[in-house]
């Protein structure tokens, strides 16, 4: 039996606040643009002395992410961080500098510090917040080599304080939604499986006023979700379909919908994966975690939109009752599917989840997210772009625009009837993979999904290359990224919320 206590969301202990400029800090971090000989010190932090020390003791020139430390009178320690070229400074760089500052303070074993980078307080604080995520609750001994940063105070002018505090509070809430997604993705699969995952989604999201409905195996059988049930039949863990509702606009407004793949562990089934690297397949539910995260974010900021989140949860296991290559299953849509590879299971559970979502809710659009294909990594590499497939140009362009704004970038791939015909099955309506040698595996997977989308505006995001990061980034430690939460939150905020 699992314990919900094990699922405590990993919100960091570090305290981040916004405060008016004051010299009353032992360690202060200040920013300096490239080739600039004046540092913004708020008029009280001895900026001229800092510049003199740089000239005398260092070749520091303000390159982005470069650091220089110097001591000042009264036992003050000043750390200068390079901001790069002023004309290239933007919101994403503000976030990245915040994360870099957090890492530098940790490296220097500094537990408390103030930060002054004029005009960028909220984003710098947010970057530090995002980078501070940690997931170490299963460790029984603390690593003494690591110094935890306990408190960062970001300084602003008096007249900017109120706006900066309000902006950061809005960003912090989104950050907590990202942390929720990261925590789910990082949980081990013996702790996070369909039943426990569904229970914890309900526990976390009902706090914010979201409505949660959980369909069990019997209910899915009644709805004839043969594609989803076929994937789950080899596991002792029963599948779940979780429906999340946010009602932030009038009842007359059509909802928008997000659908997530939630394979809590993927062995590949009978089409078994290689053992090397299989441990990373606990991440195969990252799409569902993003959906949970974005629904959490929308409710947290009381977004003026009606939104539906649907996550299909199953474990793809090897067992005596596991699905076999060449099985034929009947999906909720009534279409029959020849299963040629049991490791192409994500598209099977999404087939029923997409059909269920459009059939029940008639949404304005559906966006599904899934760690669907290794081929997307071959095409785009790791961590830079997620793959985008869509039947609607306006939706696709808006997704690309939102992704560029928050640096969660998308690259659109083609879809057409020629590709679609390749996945026709000789004995069923469709087969779940293309014949050997066809190539374009990510496109074929998307074409398969489109078979279960009627006239609804739809987009598919293949996040297999962006869901986790082996080395970490300025705003994310090594591991789960929570990719898509910021992107979809921005999409809704910019294009789909009701006007006042």
From Swiss-Prot:
InterPro entries: Leucine_aapep/pepB (IPR011356), Macro_dom-like (IPR043472), Peptidase_M17_C (IPR000819), Peptidase_M17_leu_NH2_pept (IPR023042), Peptidase_M17_N (IPR008283). Keywords: Aminopeptidase, Cytoplasm, Hydrolase, Manganese, Metal-binding, Protease. Binds 2 manganese ions per subunit. Mn(2+) 2 binds at residues 261, 266, 284, 345. The active site is at residues 273, 347. One of its GO terms (molecular function) is metalloaminopeptidase activity. Mn(2+) 1 binds at residues 266, 343, 345. GO terms for biological process: proteolysis. GO terms for cellular component: cytoplasm. It is an enzyme of class 3 (hydrolase). It is found in: Cytoplasm. It catalyses: Release of an N-terminal amino acid, Xaa-|-Yaa-, in which Xaa is preferably Leu, but may be other amino acids including Pro although not Arg or Lys, and Yaa may be Pro. Amino acid amides and methyl esters are also readily hydrolyzed, but rates on arylamides are exceedingly low; Release of an N-terminal amino acid, preferentially leucine, but not glutamic or aspartic acids. Its main location: cytoplasm. Its cofactor is Mn(2+). Its EC number is 3.4.11.1, 3.4.11.10. SUPFAM superfamilies: Macro domain-like (SSF52949), Zn-dependent exopeptidases (SSF53187). The keyword Protease applies. NCBIfam families: PRK00913.1-2, PRK00913.1-4, PRK00913.2-2, PRK00913.2-4, PRK00913.3-5. Belongs to the peptidase M17 family. Presumably involved in the processing and regular turnover of intracellular proteins. Catalyzes the removal of unsubstituted N-terminal amino acids from various peptides. This is Probable cytosol aminopeptidase. The gene is pepA.
């Amino acid at each position: 039996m699992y314990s919900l206590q094990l699922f405590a969301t990993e919100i960091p202990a570090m305290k981040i606040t916004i405060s008016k400029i004051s010299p009353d800090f032992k360690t202060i971090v200040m920013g300096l643009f490239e080739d600039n000989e004046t540092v913004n010190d708020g008029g009280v932090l001895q900026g001229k002395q800092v510049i003199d020390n740089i000239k005398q003791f260092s070749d520091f020139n303000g390159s982005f992410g470069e650091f220089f430390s110097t001591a000042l009178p009264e036992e003050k320690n000043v750390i200068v961080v390079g901001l790069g070229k002023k004309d290239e400074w933007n919101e994403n760089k503000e976030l990245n500098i915040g994360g870099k500052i957090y890492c530098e303070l940790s490296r220097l074993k500094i537990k408390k510090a103030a930060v002054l980078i004029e005009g960028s307080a909220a984003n710098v604080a947010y970057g530090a917040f995002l980078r501070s995520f940690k997931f170490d609750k299963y460790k029984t001994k603390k690593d003494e080599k690591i110094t935890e940063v306990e408190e960062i105070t970001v300084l602003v002018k008096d007249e900017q304080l109120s706006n900066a505090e309000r902006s950061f509070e809005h960003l912090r809430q989104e950050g907590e939604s990202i942390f929720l997604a990261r925590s789910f993705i990082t949980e081990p699969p013996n702790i996070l499986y369909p039943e426990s995952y569904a229970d914890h989604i309900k526990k976390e999201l009902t706090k914010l006023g979201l409505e949660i409905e959980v369909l069990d195996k019997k209910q899915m059988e009644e709805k004839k979700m043969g594609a989803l049930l076929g994937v789950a039949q080899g596991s002792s863990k029963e599948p779940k379909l979780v429906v999340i509702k946010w009602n932030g606009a009038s009842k007359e407004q059509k909802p928008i919908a997000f659908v997530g793949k939630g394979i809590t562990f993927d062995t590949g089934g009978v089409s078994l994966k290689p053992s090397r690297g299989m441990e990373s397949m606990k991440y195969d539910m990252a799409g569902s975690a993003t959906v949970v995260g974005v629904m959490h974010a929308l409710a947290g900021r009381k977004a003026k939109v009606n939104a539906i989140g649907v996550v299909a949860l199953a474990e793809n296991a090897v067992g005596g009752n596991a699905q076999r290559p060449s099985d034929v299953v009947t999906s909720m849509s009534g279409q029959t599917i020849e299963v040629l590879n049991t490791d192409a299971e994500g598209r099977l559970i999404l087939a029923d989840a997409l059909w269920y979502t459009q059939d029940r809710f008639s949404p304005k659009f559906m966006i599904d997210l899934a760690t669907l294909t290794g081929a997307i990594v071959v095409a785009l590499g790791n961590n830079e772009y997620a793959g985008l497939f869509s039947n609607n140009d306006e939706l696709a362009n808006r997704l690309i625009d939102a992704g560029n704004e928050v640096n969660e970038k998308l690259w659109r791939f083609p879809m057409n009837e020629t590709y679609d015909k390749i996945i026709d099955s000789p004995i069923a309506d469709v087969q779940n993979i293309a014949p050997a040698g066809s190539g374009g595996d990510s496109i074929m997977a998307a074409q398969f999904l489109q078979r279960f989308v009627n006239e609804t505006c739809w987009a598919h995001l293949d996040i297999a290359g962006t869901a986790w990061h082996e080395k970490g980034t300025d705003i994310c430690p090594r591991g789960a990224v929570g990719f898509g939460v910021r992107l979809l939150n921005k999409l809704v905020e910019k294009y789909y919320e009701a006007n006042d």
